[in-house]
């Protein structure tokens, strides 16, 4: 999953400058939008949509229950990927803004963790869930204009995220039971057949069962909220991942700082607005926005601050390594969900027609910009041609367009950077012998960051598309002959988040389940995550811990309790 925590690409930034000249707008060579004059704290652009709840549209940072700008008063632009036009701006926070946000979260934690029992936290989460559902269409509309995804996909993301909040609300009620008091452990044996050694003498000095000293001691474990949790959220599924990270931490009694991607800050701010209405105390959920250019500095400052006790990051493996390096300096608790270059394996006995439909749905969801989207489609040579034809027929049904246009099933890429990378990957494959079966592999003419669904055949393992996370509506088809061969090739990747297998042979399914090195496996279907999963495992550089993160936000304390008898 790509993320904007660090990037070599320039961002689009709105800079406020004081001048007596007219309020003209200029664009520099670095793609920086400069607004001359002193605009209001939240500069207003003509919105391309209308919300039922206009108060839900927030454009400032959310700190301790207040809507504030950055200290520099600079702002960055939020673009609609479907048009390439600016429709909002947000504060471009810097390192100077970090301490005040963390101070707010820490002071709120001191009260929230001690005075809000589990049942009250569950009630707050349920209230938040109801408000999210009530604002379902407004939130989805914001998502469409942030990410570019079609409206039906945005609505599905809202529903999924709301379901996570409701699930964690249920889990919250089970978090504060009285700690169990274990039975006294047997003492070391004091009798020895031979003469006592120095170790025997030390053991004989320990209390034995039945003595007063032994009966007065009990072991206990007290689980407490770990503290301030930082959520670094990508632009691919900004609402769902903000809710997944935040709801788990809030259920545990922690406070949360959300640092959304520079492409998708408005949805996180809308969720903070609803959290206020739900009754969460000030400072429990803070949102700090910043531009792409300032993201590395701000993220590092947040990760390295001593009052931040846990960090949850979703994004690329490259950036995840940098986040991990920043966190390990202070030994913070860390949760990483990283990239995937997912294989999709079609054996000759699979239901080819249904498999082609499933592949099209999985691959072109959000224009291929999902960490679990299939990138490498391995097809048994005996059914390669027939399956290719079925897949092309399914892909040809997709309707490319703006996410708010009725009937759209494939939206634009979220960023121009992603579009340029997709073009480069496609060109590399074709230069090395790949053949286009569908699409152009290039940007569509007109406004927005559109690319038609593209299918390439004749793919080889030496092409960049086989090695890198694509995050675009491009799919490569690879031929294989044996099960051992396809397992070896599928596992030959540094990022193995997900994988898919389609066959009617149940023995083969179990073998693939055991042999494929992927954290999430879809057998004859999708491998979507759900909140009840306890943990993902280490799979290459893809996943460390999973959606069920409540235990990640709790700390354990060991104690020896002496009863005053």
Task: Tell where the protein language model's regions lie, with residue ranges.
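ALDH superfamily catalytic-core signature
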Residues: 318-460
